[in-house]
């Protein structure tokens, strides 16, 4: 199996068949498990093996198949699937931190991630320093003796900022800290975060892994020691486990993720070229486009630029709303990574609860639009975008 190519792993890794020989992965809709003897029950509670099941909050055969497929494509030692992407983010950070510890985070974060970092962690007595994620000197200067975790998104939501993962990992490790990376926008197909030096990688499986807007889910990947000894003891007692049904849907999503994301990335590149220079667009962002501020870094650590294009319209919120309301094919939605193309206005949706000054500093202006590119015909998408832009 270890010599399989990625697309083969996406279809076959982790699959275990029951005695019935089902072709599709079995869906184990059960909250608990029965034991042949009292001795077997005792043994399972002692061993606590990921392949021996005692309760749905701790593990499930369908969920484990999803975890093992993610392990194979990410190149991780172990993984644990969660109920949502934010459960993955929260659990990955909370299990490593206690009162008096220090966390360094990039300022460029999804709104809910920023709330966890800048609000919840501070309330729990954890020191937090926010830095410009693209500036290695700021990461280095922020390190303290009690720094336990460095946290970043690369690519960031929604400004598509690219951080030097290897550079931040080196700084973190020299100071005895761990690097946690939210890799949702880049996907495991276009950026192998653990190979770049990250200790823990997080995904909202809700996005590209499902890819069709059906289910919520998250997954945390890292070393066996971290997952088994640090993350799982915290997670199984706090409870945000993935449901077996959602895991089954995610397994089906993984079978086609490479086909979808390749098509989405190709569409994104065509859209960038079509929109460049448009009179109503003041700024357009895509990581592997030569105009991107971190272009050289992006092409050094990514194979493709992802599935999201962001741009700023002249005319602020009024222009952004006029543009969104004029779209016909592209749907207004705050989700991303879907087979359908989706557009949103971050200031009034995903980053609404972020302080206005922080939004402006991050480049999330009133005219800013995030476009999650789908798998539709690129010509149709470009026509839809250009026609909507003319109505701004």
What is each residue range found by the language model?
Residues 1-60, 68:
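N-terminal "arm"/small-domain region of PLP-dependent enzymes with the aminotransferase-like
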Residues 250-259, 307-314, 370-374:
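Short, well-ordered beta-strand elements within core beta-sheets of diverse protein domains
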Residues 37-87, 112-119:
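Conserved N-terminal alpha-helix of the aminotransferase class I/II PLP-enzyme fold
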Residues 269-338, 354-360:
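Conserved small-domain helix->loop->beta segment predominantly found in fold-type I
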Residues 32, 222-226, 254, 313-318:
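Short loop segments at secondary-structure junctions
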Residues 118-119, 127-129, 141, 145, ...:
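PLP-dependent enzyme catalytic core of the Aspartate aminotransferase-like
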Residues 155, 184-186, 289, 314, ...:
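Active-site beta-loop-alpha junctions enriched in small/polar residues
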Residues 7-19, 79-280, 285:
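Conserved PLP-enzyme active-site core in the AAT-like
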């Amino acid at each position: 199996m270890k010599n399989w190519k990625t697309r083969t792993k996406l279809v076959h890794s982790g699959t275990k068949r029951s005695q019935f020989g089902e072709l599709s992965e079995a869906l184990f809709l059960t909250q608990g498990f029965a034991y042949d003897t009292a001795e077997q029950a005792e043994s399972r509670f002692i061993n606590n093996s990921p392949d021996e099941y005692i309760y749905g909050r701790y593990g499930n055969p369908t969920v484990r198949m999803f975890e093992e497929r993610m392990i194979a494509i990410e190149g991780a030692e172990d993984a644990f699937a969660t109920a949502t992407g934010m459960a993955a983010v929260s659990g990955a950070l909370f299990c490593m931190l206690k009162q008096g510890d220090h966390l360094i985070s990039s300022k460029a974060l999804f709104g809910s991630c920023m709330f966890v970092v800048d609000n919840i962690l501070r309330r729990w007595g954890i020191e937090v320093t926010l830095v410009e994620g693209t500036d290695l000197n700021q990461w280095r200067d922020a390190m303290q003796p009690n720094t336990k975790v460095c946290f970043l998104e690369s690519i960031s939501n929604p400004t598509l900022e690219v951080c030097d993962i290897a550079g931040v990992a080196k700084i973190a490790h020299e100071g005895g800290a761990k690097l946690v990376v939210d890799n949702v926008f880049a996907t495991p197909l276009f950026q192998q975060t653990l190979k770049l030096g990250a200790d823990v990688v997080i995904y909202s499986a809700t996005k590209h892994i499902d890819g069709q807007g059906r289910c919520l889910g998250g997954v945390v990947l890292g070393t066996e020691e971290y997952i088994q000894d640090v993350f799982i003891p915290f997670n199984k007692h706090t409870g945000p486990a993935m449901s077996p049904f959602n895991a089954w849907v995610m397994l089906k999503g993984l079978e086609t993720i490479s086909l979808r994301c390749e098509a989405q990335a190709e569409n994104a590149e065509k859209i960038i070229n079509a929109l460049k220079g448009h009179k109503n667009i003041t700024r357009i962002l895509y990581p592997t486009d030569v105009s991107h501020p971190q272009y050289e870094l992006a092409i050094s650590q990514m194979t493709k630029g992802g599935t999201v294009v962001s741009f700023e319209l002249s005319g602020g919120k009024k222009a952004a709303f006029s543009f969104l309301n004029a779209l016909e094919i592209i749907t207004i939605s705050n989700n991303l990574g879907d087979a359908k193309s989706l557009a949103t206005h971050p200031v009034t949706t995903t980053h609404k609860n972020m302080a206005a000054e922080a939004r402006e500093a991050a480049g999330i202006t009133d005219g800013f639009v995030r476009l999650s590119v789908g798998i539709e015909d690129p010509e149709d998408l470009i026509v839809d975008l250009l026609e909507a832009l003319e109505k701004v």
